[in-house]
Amino acid sequence: MLNQFSRTELIFGKEAMEKLAGSRVAIFGIGGVGGFTAEALARSGVGTLDIIDDDKVCLTNINRQIFATRKTVGRYKVEAAKERLLEINPDMTVNCWQTFYTPEIADQFDFSQYDYVVDAIDTVTGKIELVMNAQKCRTPIICSMGAGNKVDPTRFEVADIYSTSVCPLARVMRYELKKRGVRKLKVVYSKEKPITPADDMAISCKQHCVCPPGTKRKCTHRNQVPGSNAFVPSVVGLIIAGEVIKDITGFRGVK
């Protein structure tokens, strides 16, 4: 019988759809990258999503984040995301974690209960901690490298962290992971050299912060606020979703 996932089943098959329905995926960070990953996984039939983010929707998020609209500005991202995801698939389960992932709270998460972990956060400390905890439990994890200050979505690719180049974030991650004995890690990264954002005080988030009241990590506390657009982080998020779906189902297409 036809259902909302019938077109997806035409490609992946019934068994794969059953695997997706029975899977649980954790997405750490649901901004420009993680939001599109969550959207794609919900539209692909993943049964349970855990979404982790402590941020509120800001006016400046609207240019790139799928859960950010004029109506959701000021709301916690996980709340706005859950509402939309359940509109897409009312039968799925969405667990919200309104928290910022750091080593100090890592023990709140049991990584063994996840079929896959998505790292879409923007701090090196948090990313390293995610990788270490996921791999300790032998839970598959995929990490997003730098998506800010870039304009060519066609340059992004899936690779092992030790095969990456150019990306400044990937360089730091390689160094830190090697020190910790991590041998491999699937990432999505780009060889495009980052653009230096305009130094224009009139549009500076640090000078004219519009973060909603109650925002814990405001622009004024950041070393630099990167430039962004609608067509780069979204592509990264969709690439990640594709990898998660293919790995969970074991489907690789026509050889």
Regions found by a protein language model. Give the residues of each.
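N-terminal charged helix/coil linker that caps or initiates catalytic domains
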Residues: 1-26
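Conserved SAM/SAH-binding loop
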Residues: 98-106
